[in-house]
């Protein structure tokens, strides 16, 4: 009850932060005259001066006012653009590691230059992250003259870039690229066989453009580098033939069965489940087709792979629809980003789902893949020392940014007040009535000379709208995943008088819609335009611009509400940029997905109570509130799913960091002889203890087993039984010493034959190979564990705790296997002198061959919904936080940071 009063007295946290920053803005403004008086050379020289002052102990915070003043003056001279005061606040927000929410058209790209310039002075590199290659290249080339004027270098990273070019881009002061490329390069670096092959430096400071798209929308999507696994395309084809014979089981709300069937669909969680009748039916069909042995169950351990194929086929047919979740282009399945409407070339669904869709569409089925390396955007971006971001819509997700990334959101006030009118939603009974109303609104707006942007949620809807408009004879442009190449061109002219554009969701995001059209695009379309032509184009544009403003600006029409309020706000934000006039209106029907699944009953009852007739619309605050409540419910559920994904991945991430740290230490080490000697000692001790338990009687010794193990692991055929028979004084400790001496001498002899330098190089390469192979297998094992762990909930066990416990056991086994397999390979190897240059060339050829077979993909985050549900149904056990390691150095006898309960030296300290 006191919160509103306190807010009135002291202002909101956002207002207090802005008030604090305004003092620094005044300091920057006070330096403006001084900067204006400097020559270009003197202004450029400020960069070297700042670097020198940093080296002498000054901080970036102390340099900020002067550095911002320098960047502002450079912007005026090079770009013809001066940073507004609110843009200075935006720059400070980014520098302080926060998210700046700025409305469309407020100059986010220019704001970024302030924080980027300041942080690039440290020489540690700055990464500017965008959602696609087009924006990365556009922004880098747009701002390059400014940075180069100030003496900084700019690089761009992209897919299929030559290694040397990419390495140079990362070495630049400022590097632009997409979130995908930065993430994949991180994974590639941790698969490199030498330091020279690595691309990235330390992850210092990152500015993420459209941060909500990358850290929220993409958060559930793992980045995966994979290699081909065994071919099972015939199985997908067989399963695909069986799926259409299954029927859906449907029940009404009261539980009355209206259609007996084999499976149920939960639209809220996007899950499909076989019921008992379905399991029996599918088992019978699989038995008849010879895929399942007579009398066997699908749930037998050796048939679980077959069950996975069945569910993949079921999901492909019942949850994935052509032109909604994917399109077919050039014989390939291209997934559609539900948030932007863009296709995602190269991205494949995991767990055989992509292959199942290929079988459904009668396409060539590509081989399944095996994970070689993986991470998530959540974990990758948390590796940066400082993280920041910009977007037009972050405030609705402020809680998630704070919880997951420790990022606060600052709402930056606009330079000019918002003049856009946001009309109440109109809700109709049927979709046909809704579309008719949209066309009426379009006609009225176009008659006034206003440009109109119609936002749709799917390609299917955009094409349906297009067909309706064609019947009416209304000229329009369609922007969706099918016409991705024309995106920038269509968006550029979407603000022309009377222009009508249909866009799937937020396709074209990152490009402003300028009222009157884009005169620069018109100039660019001409070959060698004269100054007179350019002047004429600008004059014509000015007239059109004024004409559109007087008509009321851009009118945004949405054909339905999205699950997320943020996506709705992004669509609205296309109108009313920089204080321009504009308006928005959402048209809904009870047949829309969101309304049908989440909000229909309450609204339907309300509409019935009003006695609404066909063609009538309801425009009421209660309806809008009901819809927003439904959206909040979906947002909350999606947040829980993303949070749960992170909790599971945090376990894998700690293991990933340990393995990658070990790998990087290996690459940096010149000599790992001592490490190999330690491994040999530990493996030998474990082998001896396994067959000759400590403090045991000779009668309890398994001498034959020890001889066999030494022959297997160390390639040493030692007559241990003969030694014992000949020497009565040979007891446990002296036997252990003799075995160590024999094996060490044999290895030293091998070193003498090969040469110390050659063997050290060979040891490093073997350890890297063993580590990579076992890590790859470990990832596969972790995947299997992860996808089945939710079933523990039915046994009244907490799935997260079980996953954490079992994954730790698996990791301990991995560490032991790395040591044992490395020693086994080194012990069995036959010494053959090879020219070092030939050896290096051979290894490089093998690495290139491996790289050629790799796939860089995003897997879906499959099964998260069912996992979430199962864990809720399981035991009510308090879930411990996922293990987080701080930077403090642990003593070897202290409890390990991972939460295993073991001492550090017996746990993760073993490999550090």
UniProtKB/Swiss-Prot annotation:
It is found in: Cell inner membrane; Cytoplasm. Zn(2+) binds at residues 896, 898, 907-908. One of its GO terms (biological process) is protein import. Pfam families: P-loop_SecA, SEC-C, SecA_DEAD, SecA_PP_bind, SecA_SW. Its cofactor is Zn(2+). The keyword DNA-binding does not apply. ATP binds at residues 87, 105-109, 512. CDD domains: DEXDc_SecA, SF2_C_secA. Belongs to the SecA family. Monomer and homodimer. Part of the essential Sec protein translocation apparatus which comprises SecA, SecYEG and auxiliary proteins SecDF-YajC and YidC. This is Protein translocase subunit SecA. One of its GO terms (cellular component) is cytosol. Keywords: ATP-binding, Cell inner membrane, Cell membrane, Cytoplasm, Membrane, Metal-binding, Nucleotide-binding, Protein transport, Translocase, Translocation, Transport, Zinc. May bind 1 zinc ion per subunit. PROSITE patterns: SECA_MOTOR_DEAD. One of its GO terms (molecular function) is metal ion binding. It is an enzyme of class 7 (translocase). It is a peripheral membrane protein. Its EC number is 7.4.2.8. Part of the Sec protein translocase complex. Interacts with the SecYEG preprotein conducting channel. Has a central role in coupling the hydrolysis of ATP to the transfer of proteins into and across the cell membrane, serving both as a receptor for the preprotein-SecB complex and as an ATP-driven molecular motor driving the stepwise translocation of polypeptide chains across the membrane. SUPFAM superfamilies: Helical scaffold and wing domains of SecA (SSF81886), P-loop containing nucleoside triphosphate hydrolases (SSF52540), Pre-protein crosslinking domain of SecA (SSF81767). InterPro entries: Helicase_ATP-bd (IPR014001), P-loop_NTPase (IPR027417), SEC_C_motif (IPR004027), SecA (IPR000185), SecA_DEAD (IPR011115), SecA_motor_DEAD (IPR014018), SecA_preprotein_X-link_dom (IPR011130), SecA_SF2_C (IPR044722). The keyword Cell inner membrane applies. It catalyses: ATP + H2O + cellular proteinSide 1 = ADP + phosphate + cellular proteinSide 2. The lineage of its organism: Bacteria, Pseudomonadati, Pseudomonadota, Gammaproteobacteria, Pseudomonadales.
């Amino acid at each position: 009850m006191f919160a509103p009063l306190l807010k009135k007295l002291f202002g909101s946290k956002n207002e207090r932060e802005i008030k604090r920053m305004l003092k620094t803005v005044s300091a920057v403004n006070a330096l403006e005259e001084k900067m204006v008086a400097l020559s270009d050379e003197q202004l450029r020289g400020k960069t070297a001066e700042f670097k020198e002052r940093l080296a002498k102990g000054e901080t970036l915070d102390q340099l900020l006012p002067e550095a911002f003043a320098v960047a502002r003056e450079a912007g005026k001279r090079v770009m013809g653009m001066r940073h507004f005061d609110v843009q200075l606040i935006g720059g400070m927000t980014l520098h302080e590691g926060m998210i700046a929410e700025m409305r469309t058209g407020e100059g986010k790209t220019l704001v970024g230059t302030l924080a980027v310039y300041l942080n690039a002075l440290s020489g540690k590199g700055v990464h500017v992250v965008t959602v696609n290659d087009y924006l990365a290249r556009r922004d880098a080339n747009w701002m390059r003259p400014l940075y180069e004027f100030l003496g900084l270098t700019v690089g761009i990273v992209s897919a299929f870039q030559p290694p040397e070019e990419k390495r140079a881009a990362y070495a630049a002061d400022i590097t632009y690229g997409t979130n995908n490329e930065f993430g994949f390069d991180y994974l590639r670096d941790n698969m490199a066989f030498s330091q020279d092959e690595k691309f990235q430096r330390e992850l210092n400071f990152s500015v993420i453009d459209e941060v909500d798209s990358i850290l929220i929308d993409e958060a559930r999507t793992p980045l995966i580098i994979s290699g081909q696994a065994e071919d099972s395309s015939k199985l997908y084809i067989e399963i695909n033939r069986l799926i259409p014979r299954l029927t859906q089981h449907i029940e009404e709300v009261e539980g009355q069965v209206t259609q007996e069937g084999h499976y149920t669909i939960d639209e809220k969680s996007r899950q499909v489940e076989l019921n008992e009748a379905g399991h029996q039916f599918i088992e019978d069909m699989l038995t008849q087709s010879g895929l399942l042995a007579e009398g066997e169950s699908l749930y037998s351990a050796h048939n679980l792979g077959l069950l996975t194929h069945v569910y993949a086929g079921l999901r492909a047919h019942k949850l994935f629809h052509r032109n909604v979740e994917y399109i077919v282009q050039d014989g390939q399945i291209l997934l559609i980003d539900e948030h932007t409407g863009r296709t995602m070339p190269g991205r494949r669904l995991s767990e055989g789902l992509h292959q199942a869709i290929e079988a459904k569409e009668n396409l060539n089925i590509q081989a399944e893949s095996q994970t070689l390396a993986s991470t998530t955007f959540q974990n990758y971006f948390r590796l940066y020392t400082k993280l920041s971001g910009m977007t037009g819509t972050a405030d609705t997700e402020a809680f998630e940014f704070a919880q997951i990334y420790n990022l606060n959101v600052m709402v930056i006030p606009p330079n000019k007040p918002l003049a856009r009118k946001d009309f109440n939603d109109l809700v109709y009974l049927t979709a046909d009535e809704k579309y008719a109303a949209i066309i009426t609104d379009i006609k009225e707006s176009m008659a006034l000379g206003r440009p109109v942007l119609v936002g749709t949620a799917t390609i299917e809807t955009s094409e349906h709208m297009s067909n309706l408009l064609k019947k009416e004879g209304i000229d329009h442009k369609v922007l969706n995943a099918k016409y991705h190449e024309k995106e920038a061109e269509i968006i550029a002219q979407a603000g022309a008088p009377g222009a009508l554009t249909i866009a799937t969701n937020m396709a074209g995001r990152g490009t402003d819609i300028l009222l009157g059209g884009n005169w620069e695009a018109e100039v660019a379309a001409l070959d060698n335009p004269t100054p007179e032509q350019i002047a004429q184009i600008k004059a014509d544009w000015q007239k059109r611009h004024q004409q559109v403003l007087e008509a009321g600006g851009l009118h945004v029409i949405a054909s339905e509400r999205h699950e997320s309020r943020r996506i709705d706000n992004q669509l609205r934000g296309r109108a009313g940029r920089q204080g321009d006039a504009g308006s928005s209106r959402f048209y809904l029907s009870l047949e829309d997905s969101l309304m049908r699944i989440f909000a229909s009953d309450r609204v339907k009852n309300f509409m019935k109570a009003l006695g609404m007739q066909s063609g009538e619309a309801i425009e009421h605050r209660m309806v809008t509130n009901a819809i927003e409540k439904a959206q909040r419910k979906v947002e909350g559920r999606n947040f829980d799913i993303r949070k749960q994904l992170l909790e599971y991945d945090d376990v894998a991430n700690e293991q990933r960091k340990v393995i990658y740290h070990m790998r990087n230490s290996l690459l940096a080490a010149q000599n790992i002889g001592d490490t190999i000697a330690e491994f040999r000692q530990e493996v030998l001790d474990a082998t001896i203890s396994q067959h000759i338990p400590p403090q045991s009687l000779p009668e309890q010794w398994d001498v034959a087993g020890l001889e066999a193990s030494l022959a297997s692991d160390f390639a040493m055929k030692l007559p241990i039984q003969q030694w014992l028979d000949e020497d009565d004084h040979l007891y446990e400790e002296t036997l252990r010493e003799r075995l160590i001496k024999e094996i060490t001498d044999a290895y030293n002899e091998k070193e003498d034959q090969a040469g110390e330098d050659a063997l050290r190089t060979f040891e490093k390469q073997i350890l890297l190979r063993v580590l990579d192979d076992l890590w790859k297998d470990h990832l596969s094992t972790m995947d299997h564990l992860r996808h089945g762990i939710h079933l523990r909930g039915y046994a009244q066990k907490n799935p997260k705790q079980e996953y954490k416990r079992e994954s730790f056991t698996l990791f301990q086994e991995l560490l032991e296997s790395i040591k044992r397999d490395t020693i086994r390979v080194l012990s069995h190897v036959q010494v053959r002198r090879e020219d070092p240059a030939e050896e290096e060339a051979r290894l490089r050829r093998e690495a290139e061959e491996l790289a050629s077979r790799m796939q860089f993909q995003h897997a879906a985050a499959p099964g998260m919904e069912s996992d979430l549900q199962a864990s809720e149904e399981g035991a009510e056990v308090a879930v411990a936080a996922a293990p987080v390691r701080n930077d403090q150095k642990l003593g070897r006898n202290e409890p390990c940071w991972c939460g295993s309960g073991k001492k550090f030296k017996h746990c993760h300290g073993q490999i550090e």
